[in-house]
From Swiss-Prot:
Catalytic activity: 2 hydrogencarbonate(in) + chloride(out) = 2 hydrogencarbonate(out) + chloride(in)
Membrane topology note: Multi-pass membrane protein
Native organism: Tursiops truncatus (Atlantic bottle-nosed dolphin)
Any one Gene Ontology cellular component term annotated for this protein: plasma membrane
Full protein name: Prestin
The UniProt record lists the keyword Iron-sulfur: no
Site (Contributes to anion binding): R399
Ranges of compositional bias, category Low complexity: 721-730
Job of this protein: Voltage-sensitive motor protein that drives outer hair cell (OHC) electromotility (eM) and participates in sound amplification in the hearing organ. Converts changes in the transmembrane electric potential into mechanical displacements resulting in the coupling of its expansion to movement of a charged voltage sensor across the lipid membrane. The nature of the voltage sensor is not completely clear, and two models compete.
Subunit field text: Homodimer. Interacts (via STAS domain) with CALM; this interaction is calcium-dependent and the STAS domain interacts with only one lobe of CALM which is an elongated conformation.
Positions annotated as glycosylated: N163, N166
């Protein structure tokens, strides 16, 4: 078989032929039989919901306490090695990040270690993701620090006359109290949202919004770390324009920078950048990523202790890391009214980051995570952790990738990482007291690389979606200059406004037919597509509701070029010309079709109807004009059917239905039929509930598809033409007579 024959056979087999009736809605319903649905009473539903069975109890336990499901099924020989390696790798990264992120949270470094221990243990019991690493996260830590600095600024005067500049410990103790209160309220909010099954709130934080927000947060973190890198003493700012004030403060004091501190920081910065590039390039050959941050901490501590950098060169170091765990303490709930806005923002951002990474890794490894249970888990981690003086936590992106990439299989990997932190807290913490803060600053800045790379989103969104570009930019700018809390609120409002804008200003398309097919596509996009004679097909890609119904009606008339008011006015003028030529003065007052209101002869407009009155359209028949009158009619007055493609309309409200009824009636007044094609069951239900089909004959306007509507229109016109040809001439009939519907 040669290539030509094969091509011909292939072309023949890639066709389909269908012979079926034209499916209007009534015809289709006659062919279908709805399935009987058993509707349960409210009493039956309540009885079923509160029925207690062993299986239901077991499922509830599995849902609320996931460890009871995955731990008994733990494959020891298959999982244990990967979890151990992953736990150690994550733990050595969690140590320096915990110390560094405590600086962002404006609390002593040891509290970063507490926050790397307690919440991780809690998540092991209640979390559903096997691979994410829970603990301090730069963005959340910065948001906590913003609240702490706002309520306890650097120059605060402690009650009793002790100035904060002379009592750093007293100031830090107050900031810890603020951080505990914010963390407790954040946990309560997350837990309540999870119990109420509000896990869907994350969908309102779109990807452009989250990426713009985290990029702005990265700039905030970067500016916050500059003073530690340069070794200068500056006031820490929070709130509106804090990033500007922080940058200006560092630049004003740059002449006082500590050269030794900057040198150590830059050395670690270069080591980490080069090492991370090495890890990325040879990740396929390395059994596990090199723990660069841990080596940087060890090296920085060794150099600082060996050369007495703090005593000899005034390099700021971590300072005292008290051994042992602190006893539980009650957070100060009296601060809730001062921090509730921040707590809401932290709760939502923390959950959004966590569920995003959890779903990404779950999809990669073929399991599911429960968004509502993740909210509950985060809520318990934060609320319980606050009792042990931790600050709010979330999922760390960098540590999660390490935990997954080094072979972690279950939540036990995170548990092992937290045990390494516990070892530091109980026994070895004093070894890191000489660690320069510049080293921690360099670690934080290097880990911001991934967030700064998100600036590359801008050209991508410029090419793909200007609306998503707008969301990204407005989120970034508002979060950068208004602060992360108010910036997030502004961003969510802007994102919701874009949803309204998209539905209020959808795309309107006039469709044409690909010749000899049942395919209908945009007539302006392809040369081969042609309009069906006498038929206009109009498509909208959004629901029709109160926000866009008037725009839909206007767009229909504008895009199709068929405006009933103009047609009526033009026909009036044609009648006048015709009457003048035949010398029949009475013809000037004749009407072309039956209408429900007087129409102005000049512009074809109607007087306003009563606002609350919904007049649903009658079934109209097109009038027959005298043949002599046709030459006076305006060009293009030959459209007999408008087909509204509703395949992309997913719902209609009462205002939309009223507008549609007005459209059908308005076109019907000039003898033009309006058909609805491709209505979903929901749209048909909306039309029915709003009494659009009060006249049952209007069901004949509904067709299963565009092609059904086109064929139905052509059959109707052909039958009308046959009847007009077969009907005997009526010499006594008046030219303005209108056939009865």
């Amino acid at each position: 078989m040669d290539h030509v024959e094969e091509t011909e056979i292939l072309a023949a087999t890639q066709r389909y032929y269908v012979e079926r009736p034209i499916f209007s809605h009534p015809v289709l319903q006659e062919r279908l039989h709805k399935k009987d649905k058993i509707s349960e009473s409210i009493g039956d539903k309540l009885k079923q919901a509160f029925t207690c069975t062993p299986k239901k109890i077991r499922n509830i336990i599995y849902m609320f306490l996931p460890i009871t499901k995955w731990l008994p099924a733990y494959r020891f020989k298959e999982y244990v090695l990967g979890d151990i390696v992953s736990g150690i790798s994550t733990g050595v990264l969690q140590l320096p990040q915990g110390l560094a992120f405590a600086m962002l949270a404006a609390v002593p470094p040891v509290f970063g270690l507490y926050s790397s221990f307690y919440p991780v243990i809690m998540y092991c019991f209640f979390g559903t993701s096997r691979h994410i690493s829970i603990g301090p996260f730069a963005v959340i830590s910065l948001m906590i620090g913003g609240v702490a600095v706002r309520l306890v600024p650097d120059d605060i005067v402690i009650p009793g006359g002790v100035n904060a500049t002379n009592s750093t410990e007293a100031r830090d103790a107050l900031r810890v109290k603020v951080a505990m209160s914010v963390t407790l309220l954040t946990g309560i909010i997350q837990f309540c949202l999870g119990v109420c099954r509000f896990g869907f709130v994350a969908i309102y934080l779109t990807e452009p919004l989250v990426r713009g927000f985290t990029t702005a947060a990265a700039v905030h973190v970067f500016t916050s770390m500059l003073k530690y890198l340069f070794g200068v003493k500056t006031k820490r700012y929070s709130g509106i324009f804090s990033v500007v004030y922080s940058t200006v403060a560092v630049l004003q004091n740059v002449k006082n920078l500590n050269v030794c501190s900057l040198g150590v920081g830059l050395m670690v910065f270069g080591l980490l950048l080069g090492g991370k590039e090495f890890n990325e390039r040879f990740k396929e050959k390395l059994p596990a990523p090199i723990p660069l941050e841990f080596f940087a901490v060890v090296m920085g501590t060794g150099i600082s202790a060996g050369f007495s950098l703090h005593e000899s060169y005034n390099v700021d170091v971590v300072g005292t890391l008290p051994l042992g765990l602190l006893p539980p303490a009650n957070p100060d709930t009296s601060l809730f009214h001062l921090v509730y806005v921040d707590a809401i923002a932290i709760a939502i951002v923390g959950f959004s980051v966590t569920i995003s990474m959890a779903k990404t890794l779950a999809n990669k490894h073929g399991y599911q995570v429960d968004g509502n249970q993740e909210l509950i888990a985060l809520g318990l981690c934060n609320s319980t952790g606050s009792l042990f003086q931790t600050f709010a936590i979330s999922c760390s992106l960098s540590r999660s990738l390490v935990q997954e990439g080094t072979g972690g299989k279950t939540q036990l990997a995170g548990c092992l990482a937290s045990l390494m932190i516990l070892l530091v807290i109980l026994a070895t913490g004093f070894l890191f007291e000489s660690l320069p803060q510049a080293v921690l600053s360099a670690i934080v800045i290097v880990n911001l690389k991934g967030m700064f790379m998100q600036f590359s989103d801008l050209p991508f969104f410029w090419r793909t979606s200007k609306i998503e570009l707008t969301i990204w930019l407005t989120t970034f700018v508002s979060s950068l200059f208004l602060g992360l809390d108010y910036g997030l609120i502004t961003a969510v409002i802007i994102a919701l406004m874009t949803v309204i804008y998209r539905t209020q200003s959808p795309s309107y398309i006039v469709l044409g037919q690909l010749p000899d097919t049942d395919v209908y596509i945009d007539i302006d996009a392809y040369e081969e597509v042609k309009e069906v004679p006498g038929i206009k097909i109009f498509q909208i890609n959004a629901p029709i509701y109160y926000a866009n119904s008037d725009l839909y009606s206007s767009a229909l008339k504008r895009k199709t070029g068929v405006n009933p008011a103009f047609i009526l006015g033009a026909r009036r003028k044609a009648m006048k010309k015709y009457a003048k030529e035949v010398g029949n003065a009475n013809m000037a007052n004749a009407t072309v079709v039956k209408v429900d209101a007087e129409v102005d002869a000049e512009d074809g407009t109607k007087p306003e109807e009563e606002e609350d009155e919904i007049k649903y359209p009658p079934i109209v028949t097109k009038s027959t004009l005298p043949e002599e009158l046709q030459r006076f009619m305006p060009p293009g007055d030959n459209v007999h059917t408008i087909i509204l493609d509703f395949t992309q309309v997913n719902f209609m409200d009462s205002v939309g239905v009223k507008t549609l009824a007005g459209i059908v009636k308005e076109y019907g007044d000039v003898g033009i039929y309006v058909y609805l094609a491709g209505c979903s069951a929901q749209v048909v239900s909306d039309l029915t509930q709003n009494q659009f089909f009060e006249n049952p004959a209007l069901l004949d306007l509904l067709f299963h598809s565009i092609h059904d509507a086109v064929l139905g229109s052509q059959v109707r016109e052909a039958l009308a033409e046959q009847e007009a040809t077969a009907a005997p001439p009526q010499e006594d009939s008046e030219p303005n007579a209108t056939p009865e519907a």
